[in-house]
Amino acid sequence: YTIGLYKEIEKESGHSVGFKPSGGFYLASNDVWSEYLKRERSKARYMGLDQEFISLDEVKKKNPLIDPSRYLLALWDPIDGEVDPSGVTYAFAKAAKVHGGKYYTHTEVKDTKQKPDGSWDVFTDKGNINAEIIINAGGLWAREVGKLSGIDLPVQPMEHHYLITEAIPEIEAMGEQRLPIGT
């Protein structure tokens, strides 16, 4: 769904989201993560995505730097990739503007209230805004923003770790391939 949406937003906005498909896999080193990957694959299949389990030997072929003996299960996603977060944000904002929408930066939403006619009053730190439609663009704070409208969003921010190093020739030689995710 998301990849199709990115293409549509790029077309409507004329702005690239910077999508770089490279394929990627998810690795499970314990039973809890194995069960999680099985559930994720079931959801992906239901949505028509081509994720598939691959052998640990195939993992080694796709990424020779990985020791497959540490893992129990591997899930391959052929359309996995990366986007430019600022590009996605700008493309969505521009597409909204093309369709008559407005967006406000550096404006904290304090509360929202739906009126009987279906429109919304949005109370911000810079004054009140009336809108026919509101879009939750809260990012990491989407759950909290949703609560302002009485909506419980099942969004859970996840912590990821990043490591900055000098160039590693073996990783550079892999090109654009994403490094695996898992535990």
Kindly give the residue locations of the regions a language model identified.
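Generic secondary-structure signature for well-ordered alpha-helical cores
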Residues: G4, E8-K11, H15, Y46-L49, ...
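Core Rossmann-like FAD-binding/catalytic domain of the broad FAD-dependent monooxygenase superfamily
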Residues: E40, R45, Q51-I54, V59-I66, ...
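Short aromatic/basic micro-patch
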Residues: E52-F53, E82, Y103, N128
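A conserved short coil-to-beta-strand element within the FAD-binding core of flavoproteins
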Residues: I54-E58, N63, K102-W120
